[in-house]
């Protein structure tokens, strides 16, 4: 993939996700069945709308069945799945239904709290939708297909991911909110985020919305209804980006993100990589204890691998006020972080859950809408 971001004159090449690999391999399968010819490359539209030409690394086909593989290319972001082959089998059917499942090397969800139901293959919603749509577009409306995604190296590669901590067992996940992998080289990536902030400031904006990533971006636009023109990604660099807003003299910052990401800031963790600091359960337990939560709830929350899973216990026990307490602590920590440098920056916070929607905000949402319209 020949697309880049730049830092200090050096190019960082972008790549494509496992979800894009699976969609491309699935399309190659359908094309080979329909044409009865080998396919060496396919054009696919990613979940984010980017059109890519993807090489096909392996091809095999017969009258109603085909197998194809695409090699994962993460660009200059060398993650656990970079270079591995993502295989897809497609069997055509006559019932007009297109179904998708995962095979060898694709993990299975064993716990609640993630975006995949217990027992299902770990194919996230966005790539699942994209794979099905890609096959339907190539196949037409009158034929159906059974699609199986698998990765022979998946179980071994998954040991280098956080899947087991999330209750995903047996392999990798098929991921990709946008379908594109953007290199996360820290210095280069932080510089690119700063450049976007500078651009917004130069356009005359004096207040900015910081989000960790695509989920926060979607929530701001689709749930809160705020303008996309105020949004900048902070990735995992919360402290760095807060300092940058101060350097650039923004007056107001609104941080909007999934609770599992922002909860860390309430305890003074300003770089939110899970590999660097993951105290989500401990922070929740401490705050619940201060609210007088029973020991049984504290023990249940401590055992949870995700804040989504913990949310079920918290809601059942009637302690959802913990979210209000924590967002106020996120605000206080952030403003204290900026306290000793001028100019002052007002920080507000909105957190949400994938399953439960809005959890808490430092101001009434209608007040925030008025301030940020």
Curated annotation (Swiss-Prot):
SUPFAM superfamilies: CbiD-like
GO biological process: anaerobic cobalamin biosynthetic process; methylation
Reactions performed catalytically: Co-precorrin-5B + S-adenosyl-L-methionine = Co-precorrin-6A + S-adenosyl-L-homocysteine
Pathway entry: Cofactor biosynthesis; adenosylcobalamin biosynthesis; cob(II)yrinate a,c-diamide from sirohydrochlorin (anaerobic route): step 6/10
MF terms (GO), sorted A to Z: cobalt-precorrin-5B C1-methyltransferase activity
EC number in record: 2.1.1.195
Tagged with keyword Nucleotide-binding: no
Pfam family, any one: CbiD
Top-level enzyme category: transferase
Keyword annotations from UniProtKB, A to Z: Cobalamin biosynthesis, Methyltransferase, S-adenosyl-L-methionine, Transferase
InterPro entries membership: CbiD, CbiD_sf
Family assignment from sequence similarity: Belongs to the CbiD family.
Name used for this protein in its record: Cobalt-precorrin-5B C(1)-methyltransferase
Organism for this UniProt entry: Listeria monocytogenes serotype 4a (strain HCC23)
